[in-house]
Regions:
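C-terminal accessory/binding modules appended to enzymatic or scaffolding proteins
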Residues: 219, 277-330, 335
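Structured secondary-structure scaffolds
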Residues: 11-98, 284, 288, 330
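Histidine-centered active-site/metal-ligand motif
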Residues: 2, 64, 92, 108-109, ...
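Conserved hydrophobic residues forming the short capping helix/wall of the S-adenosyl-L-methionine
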Residues: 96, 226, 312
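Single conserved hydrophobic/aromatic residue that forms the stacking wall/gate
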Residues: 1-13
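Catalytic adenosine-cofactor/nucleotide-binding cores of aminoacyl-tRNA synthetases and other
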Residues: 100-269, 275, 331-363
């Protein structure tokens, strides 16, 4: 027990005009038994507990006292917190007993561990490993770390991910919409052991939830990003663009980058891929492709595809490799939305311009 505790000296301090605190008088030499929903019975000797301060010398209550009073006032039925607060349970239990009040159900959840599985996840880990750990951004001095919101994570995705860190649905199901999660969740299925924070799995959940949200939400987001970046656009094309790229989004914050080639010509090109072609052959393929496009009806993409496939065959190039060249010319990279749907959205004139532009850049 804390030797600095001065029991029974309150009146002396008052008469002398000394500053004093009010402590909780822990019973001596007794066994304190508390109940935790996950841990079961927690038993400690009262001799290991200090007489904790309830009121500080300035008259303000401490956390422990205010916590219990607040929960009593609000008629809290369940206290759910991290297991690092388990050592406070005996004191809180004693305070409830002193008030002659029934304790709420205490549930001390296991910790969330670092990605490596060792040690509690901390806010610094986000900065260190490059992923968010807070709901929103936070500042500490000159340091600012982005939260899930700023990094483009949906609230329902983070909730889904976190729920499965500490709860087992009893089957292999992982993806839950909020209403389904509410129906399925049970305190009886909470995990007792700590879980590792997997940022890749968190990203996977976010991608799944982006696929499930209404397109209109992404349309609003994209329009906002286009306006913020002062990019001109045809509002009538936005729904079709969102439908094309929705399944490619892993975070909402990259929607502008993911759709940029629909609104402006690419400035960077995958020259590593282009090196698979002889320069003269690449220029010829691009030129002949432009001729096909110039004489095509853009409402008949199947015919365009057949004509381009025939061109590749005649030039002795696999159609897959040829389409890679075509795609790099249009969007600058190999990965992107459906090529022929993209062509229809950006229009014949833009397709021709981009084909000839890349041809001119090839040495």
């Amino acid at each position: 027990r804390d030797s600095s505790t001065s029991r029974g000296l309150g009146d002396v301090y008052k008469r002398q005009g000394c500053e004093y605190v009010i402590r909780f008088k822990v019973p001596e030499s007794s066994e304190i038994k508390c109940k935790d929903f996950l841990k079961g019975t927690v038993q400690v000797s009262s001799n290991t507990l200090d007489d904790k301060v309830l009121y500080k010398s300035d008259g303000n209550p401490t956390y422990h006292f205010a916590n219990v009073v607040d929960d009593l006032d609000m008629k809290i039925s369940h206290v759910i917190r991290g297991e690092e607060w388990l050592p406070s349970l005996p004191l809180h239990s004693l305070i409830y007993s002193a008030f002659k009040q029934k304790e709420p159900i205490f549930i001390h959840l296991p910790l969330i561990l670092k990605p490596q599985g060792k040690g509690k996840l901390s806010k610094r880990d986000g900065e260190k490993f490059g992923f968010p750990v807070f709901p929103i951004s936070w500042k500490e001095g000159d340091l600012e770390i982005k939260g899930f919101r700023e990094e483009g994570y949906l609230p329902e995705a983070v909730l889904n991910f976190l729920a499965l860190l500490g709860w087992n649905p009893g089957n292999d199901e992982e993806f839950f919409l909020i209403n389904d999660l509410i129906k399925s969740f049970s305190l009886d299925a909470l995990n007792k052991s700590s879980a590792r924070f997997d940022p890749k799995k968190n990203l996977w959940f976010n991608q799944r939830h982006i696929k499930s949200i209404k397109n209109s939400k992404l349309e609003e987001l994209l329009i906002g990003e286009l306006e913020r970046n002062k990019t001109s656009f045809d509002k009538n094309k936005i729904p079709n663009i969102v439908s094309l790229i929705k399944n490619r989004l892993s975070v909402t914050t990259n929607i502008f980058e993911t759709t940029s080639y629909f609104f402006s010509d690419p400035k960077d090109f995958d020259f590593k891929f282009l090196k698979k072609f002889e320069a003269s052959e690449a220029k010829t393929l691009l030129s002949l492709s432009a001729s096909i496009i110039a004489n095509s009806d853009f409402n008949k993409t199947e015919i365009i595809k057949e004509n381009l496939e025939e061109l590749a065959y005649k030039r002795g190039v696999s159609f897959g490799k040829f389409l890679g060249l075509f795609r790099v010319a249009l969007i600058g990279k190999l990965a992107g939305a459906d090529l022929f749907e993209t062509m229809k959205l950006i229009g014949k004139e833009t397709v021709l311009k981009r084909l000839l532009n890349l041809s001119g850049l090839i040495g």
